[in-house]
Amino acid sequence: MVSMLLVGRIGKSVGLNGGLRLHLESDFPECLKKGVKVSVAPLNAFSCVSSFKEYIIHSYEHAKNLLFLETIQTPEKAKELTNLGLFMSEAESKKLCVLKEGEFFYCDLVGLSVVEENEILGKVIEIQRISQTDYFLVETTLNLVEKGLAKIFLIPYRDFYIQEILLQDKKITTHNAKTLLENS
């Protein structure tokens, strides 16, 4: 099964040529190039491949958050896509987006263990952006939950909490994160 990543949320139609307002969910607008294949589906469609409809990007104006798809050329057709999600395959995203040293795709971080001083605190189940800060939503390990700690807690993606991300070891080492868990 193809893994799909949410790129943005489609807003209202704009203009007479089928333009769509795009509320970007990605840190990589450079992926939205002419000729790139994307899919549109309801936002809850991650697991239902049959609900994805493929389109080709005609153009994207980042400054105006305007997306044009090749086969959508009227306001009426554009309105049919309002409030849907714009998705791209994980493979396509990784091919088009060049990461700098220390940058990661969200999809690579989900599932990693969160470790502090050789103690596993839990695993990342989701990443949320609140204001301008990314947060790891961490499901606490059962042995810590049994000690009365929270089942789920948030860790800001900041140097104060995140020491190192080791994809090859499938873990994120932290400092000060256990204090967040204890106070959750």
Curated annotation (Swiss-Prot):
Positions of the PRC barrel domain: 101-180
Gene Ontology molecular function: ribosome binding
Pfam families: PRC, RimM
Gene3D superfamilies (UniProt xref): PRC-barrel domain, RimM
GO CC terms in record: cytosol; ribosome
GO biological process: maturation of SSU-rRNA
Keywords from the UniProt entry: Chaperone, Cytoplasm, Ribosome biogenesis, rRNA processing
Subcellular localization(s) per the UniProt record: Cytoplasm
Domain notes: The PRC barrel domain binds ribosomal protein uS19.
Subunit structure: Binds ribosomal protein uS19.
NCBIfam families: 16S_RimM
Described purpose of this protein according to its UniProt entry: An accessory protein needed during the final step in the assembly of 30S ribosomal subunit, possibly for assembly of the head region. Essential for efficient processing of 16S rRNA. May be needed both before and after RbfA during the maturation of 16S rRNA. It has affinity for free ribosomal 30S subunits but not for 70S ribosomes.
Entry similarity comment: Belongs to the RimM family.
Protein name as it appears in the record: Ribosome maturation factor RimM
